[in-house]
């Protein structure tokens, strides 16, 4: 008898890939998960848990882990790629011989490739040329999903079929999937917020108050949207789950990897010590450098990203950098309502302002 259940493939054995695999299995799909570590493969299949990335949380027994890429991808209707950005291209190329144009390919990776400043869905598009490509992003802490805490996410794609199929595959009583057609904006939001989570962790370690945290998050949102809109994204995307939603959870939760790196740095640990203690990839560290370079090339004002770069890579003390940022010229709150240039022009109207 033929098994009519949809087949889902998940590439990646980390915390989020494992959580997505378990959701799809909860919804009745046949789920195969590809990963490299033989010991972890055996543990998922035998004990139905991932002790390295999601300790103490049960995985749906229907999830079958394997190191055989061809077998995992065989007959899969939906393919979720949950691989760190540094290895994303390599894994996509490894999978390419067994991918088909009819498959729906969805990136869950919140990062940027250094070569060409490419987002993960752009890599999928370039490498495959397939029509059904999407991005899954939002305020999604994997450990909370694994505990079946009520969670919402965004599937972003130009393709209506991709959006609909992902909503059907993952939507359930504890995981709600909203749709967007701004793939670029949703993906940029997921990558950019990691920068500011590091800054939020530093601020917490330095004992800064709630006013400071609120200021940091709202100015981070302004900076994220300024950068993304300059590159072609829709500014309204950033008032949704993939913008302010993801920013809030990543800057507030001690479960956030980037927040934890920032907190360690705020306690005067070196970057190497902070990343080593984490034991997982914190995408924000690499993203800071890439975004800072891109912003300079495109002449986009990014004071928080610039300041964080100085702390991470040039050894400037975090408290000193915060003081320097507070001394910068005051500008517009919401630039899509009142531009920075209009604020600066208005200062010329003040008594005693110099003629220019």
UniProtKB/Swiss-Prot annotation:
One GO process term, biological-process aspect: carbohydrate metabolic process
Q: Which GO terms describe its cellular component?
A: cytosol
Q: In which pathway does it act?
A: Membrane lipid metabolism; glycerophospholipid metabolism
Instruction: Give the annotated active site.
Output: 193
| Compartment list | Cytoplasm
EC number annotated for this UniProt entry: 1.1.1.94
Q: Which GO terms describe its molecular function?
A: glycerol-3-phosphate dehydrogenase [NAD(P)+] activity; NAD binding
Transmembrane helix among keywords: no
Q: Which Pfam families match?
A: NAD_Gly3P_dh_C, NAD_Gly3P_dh_N
Keyword Lipid biosynthesis among record annotations: yes
As its record notes, the protein acts as a catalyst of:
sn-glycerol 3-phosphate + NAD(+) = dihydroxyacetone phosphate + NADH + H(+); sn-glycerol 3-phosphate + NADP(+) = dihydroxyacetone phosphate + NADPH + H(+)
Q: Where would one find coiled-coil regions in this protein? A: none
Which residues participate in NADPH binding?
15-16, 36, 110, 142, 257, 281, 283
Annotated residues that bind sn-glycerol 3-phosphate are located at 110, 138, 193, 246, 256-258
Q: What class of enzyme is it?
A: oxidoreductase
Q: Which keywords has UniProt assigned to this entry?
A: Cytoplasm, Lipid biosynthesis, Lipid metabolism, NAD, NADP, Nucleotide-binding, Oxidoreductase, Phospholipid biosynthesis, Phospholipid metabolism
Q: Which domain of life is it from?
A: Bacteria
Family matches, as SUPFAM superfamilies: 6-phosphogluconate dehydrogenase C-terminal domain-like (SSF48179), NAD(P)-binding Rossmann-fold domains (SSF51735)
Q: What PANTHER family does its record include?
A: GLYCEROL-3-PHOSPHATE DEHYDROGENASE, GLYCEROL-3-PHOSPHATE DEHYDROGENASE [NAD(+)] 2, CHLOROPLASTIC
The family database entries (NCBIfam families) matched by this protein are listed as: PRK00094.1-2, PRK00094.1-4, PRK00094.2-4
Name the job this protein performs.
Catalyzes the reduction of the glycolytic intermediate dihydroxyacetone phosphate (DHAP) to sn-glycerol 3-phosphate (G3P), the key precursor for phospholipid synthesis.
Question: Which protein family is named in the record?
Answer: Belongs to the NAD-dependent glycerol-3-phosphate dehydrogenase family.
Its name, as the record gives it, is Glycerol-3-phosphate dehydrogenase [NAD(P)+]
Query: Which source organism does the UniProt entry give?
Result: Chromohalobacter salexigens (strain ATCC BAA-138 / DSM 3043 / CIP 106854 / NCIMB 13768 / 1H11)
Q: What is the lineage of its organism?
A: Bacteria, Pseudomonadati, Pseudomonadota, Gammaproteobacteria, Oceanospirillales
């Amino acid at each position: 008898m033929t098994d009519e259940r949809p087949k889902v493939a998940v590439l990646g054995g980390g915390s989020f890939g494992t959580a997505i695999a378990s959701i799809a299995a909860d919804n009745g799909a046949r789920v195969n998960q590809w990963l490299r570590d033989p010991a972890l493969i055996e543990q998922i299949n035998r004990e139905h848990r991932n002790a390295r990335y999601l300790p103490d949380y049960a995985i749906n027994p229907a999830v079958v882990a394997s190191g055989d890429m061809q077998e995992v991808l065989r007959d899969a209707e939906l393919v979720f790629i949950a691989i760190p950005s540094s290895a994303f291209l390599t894994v996509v190329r490894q999978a390419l011989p067994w991918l088909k144009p009819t498959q729906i390919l969805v990136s869950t990776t919140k990062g940027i490739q250094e070569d060409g400043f490419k987002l993960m869905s752009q890599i999928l598009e370039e490498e495959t040329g397939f029509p059904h490509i999407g991005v899954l992003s939002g305020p999604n802490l994997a450990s909370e999903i694994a505990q079946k805490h009520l969670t919402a996410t965004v599937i972003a794609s130009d393709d209506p079929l991709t959006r609909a199929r992902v909503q059907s595959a993952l939507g359930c009583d504890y995981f709600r999937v909203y749709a967007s057609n701004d793939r670029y904006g949703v993906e940029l939001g997921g990558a950019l917020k990691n920068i500011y989570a590091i800054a939020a962790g530093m601020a917490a370690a330095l004992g800064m108050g709630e006013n400071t945290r609120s200021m940091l998050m709202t100015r981070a949102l302004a900076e994220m949207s300024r950068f993304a809109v300059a590159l072609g994204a829709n500014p309204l995307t950033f008032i949704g789950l993939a913008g302010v939603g993801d920013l809030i959870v990543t800057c507030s939760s001690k479960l956030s990897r980037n927040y934890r790196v920032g907190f360690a740095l705020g306690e005067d640990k070196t970057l190497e010590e902070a990343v080593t203690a984490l034991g997982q990839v914190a995408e924000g560290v690499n993203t800071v450098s890439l975004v800072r370079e891109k912003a300079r090339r495109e002449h986009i004002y990014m004071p928080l990203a610039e300041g964080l770069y100085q702390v991470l890579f040039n050894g400037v003390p975090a408290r000193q950098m915060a003081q320097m940022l507070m001394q910068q010229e005051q500008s517009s709150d919401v630039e899509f309502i009142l531009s920075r240039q209009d604020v600066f022009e208005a200062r010329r109207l003040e008594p005693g302002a110099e003629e220019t």
